[in-house]
Design a protein with these regions (language model features):
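Cytochrome P450
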Residues: 1-411
Length: 411
């Protein structure tokens, strides 16, 4: 996406904008500088008013408080309160749902992501990773060089294909899925009408897929949502569509960003890379540290009740960003918080969120991330950024942080 239409940020403390391209690129430095200079909550008048707590304590306080903060909108954009479906259901349950409805909507989806359901996917994920590496390396050989894009040729395909198969969507539509993800999570500073048109395209695609499942039922998540009951009644069409959209978008962008960030770290920290190649049994522990240090997800809340939040006068319908990755780098919560220690054992990170909306797909995300790193290192044990300065690495914009373009050179 081009530079945001609000213009460049003048001061991160009073004019913070997560859609500024500099934000995700330099986020850890921005968070640290703000907190060290006495700003634990940043503010901005953009998007109609937005607050961003930066400490673990303050992020957790908002995440656990469902009375003063609503989840009916979780992606900050130019849209106003009137543009979102009312609580407690919201447009993409359960992530946009408030209590008490949230509990029931979430409970419907939990069985599909239980460990015993997710574990059998490992072989399929491993085969998919190997196929993507085969394709990327073959393309490099045809060009006669030793560079591949670890993001666009590898990381971005894995979760898109996996969640498509789980939902019952055509895996060959993964380019479409990537477009939907961009429109939902990165194109946030565009006009409301244009953003609405983007969601209309997603809805139209999902309506076609839902109609096909109604005519041809099968054993997948879409058919499950069409047949399950809530309070003795089938789910409403908007509930079905919203939950599918949630699983597609949340299941793709967060995990591909985590995979990409992990590979970026290994490309820029050769000692860590060599250590994991020599001792692959450390990879599961390293994965947890990558999730802590490079947590991809920042959620949002909408202020439901006017109140003073630690000296911040929050008004009804103000936005509140919840940067879980900033919480993960708070030295009050983690020893040596700004260091990436791939053998860190005590690691109660918030990469999957805090409170009632903690990610229900964490078992799947961990499996995809672990297998993706294992297969990459088994096939490409030595690599570095194609440009040592990292100038050709492109980071996302918006609430999901990760490399969108990650050229690496195979050594």
């Amino acid at each position: 996406m081009s530079a945001n239409t609000f213009g460049p940020v003048s001061d991160w403390a009073t004019d913070l904008d997560h859609a500024d391209p500099a934000y995700n690129r330099d986020a850890p430095t921005i968070w640290r500088d703000l907190v060290e200079h006495g700003c634990p909550v940043a503010h901005s008048t953009r998007y109609g008013g937005m607050w961003t707590p930066l400490t673990h304590e303050y992020v957790a306080e908002v995440a656990y408080d469902t009375e003063r903060f609503s989840s009916r909108a979780v992606v900050v954009s130019r849209s106003t309160a009137e543009d979102f479906m009312d609580a407690p259901v919201g447009g993409a349950p359960p992530i946009t749902s408030d209590p008490p409805f949230h509990h029931h909507a979430r409970r419907l989806l939990l069985p599909a992501f239980a460990p015993k359901v997710i574990e059998p996917w490992e072989d399929e994920i491993r085969a998919l990773c190997r196929a993507r590496l085969d394709a990327a390396l073959a393309a490099a050989n045809e060009r006669g060089d030793r560079t591949i894009d670890a993001a666009t040729q590898y990381a971005q395909h894995i979760p898109a294909n996996v969640i498509a198969r789980m939902l019952g969507l055509p895996p060959e539509d993964d380019e479409l899925f990537r477009g939907f993800v961009h429109d939902a999570l990165e194109a946030v500073d565009i006009e409301t009408s244009e953003r609405g048109a983007n969601f209309d395209r997603l809805d139209a695609y999902l309506d076609i897929q839902i109609a096909d499942h109604i005519e041809h039922p099968r054993d997948d998540l879409i058919s499950y949502l069409l047949n399950v009951e809530l309070f003795g009644e089938p789910l409403s069409p908007s509930h079905v569509r919203g939950s599918i959209a949630l699983l597609m978008i949340a299941g793709i962008d967060t995990t591909w960003s985590a995979i990409g960030s992990s590979l970026w770290h290994l490309a820029t920290h050769p000692d860590d890379c060599r250590r994991l190649v020599a001792r692959p049994e450390l990879i599961p522990v390293a994965i947890e540290e990558f999730l802590r240090a490079y947590a991809p997800v920042t959620m949002a809340r909408v202020v439901a009740k006017q109140h003073d939040f630690h000296g911040c006068p929050m008004e009804v319908d103000d936005w509140v960003l919840l940067p879980f990755p900033a919480a993960n780098r708070d030295p009050a919560a983690f020893d040596r918080a700004d260091e990436v220690l791939i053998d860190r054992l005590e690691n109660r990170h918030a990469a999957f969120g805090l409170g009632i909306h903690r990610c229900l797909g964490s078992n799947l995300a961990r499996l995809e991330l672990r297998v993706a790193v294992e297969e990459f290192l088994a096939r490409i044990p030595e690599f570095e950024l194609a440009n040592p300065a990292g100038d050709d690495v492109t980071w996302s914009v918006g609430q999901i942080r990760g490399p969108r373009v990650l050229p690496i050179r195979i050594l």
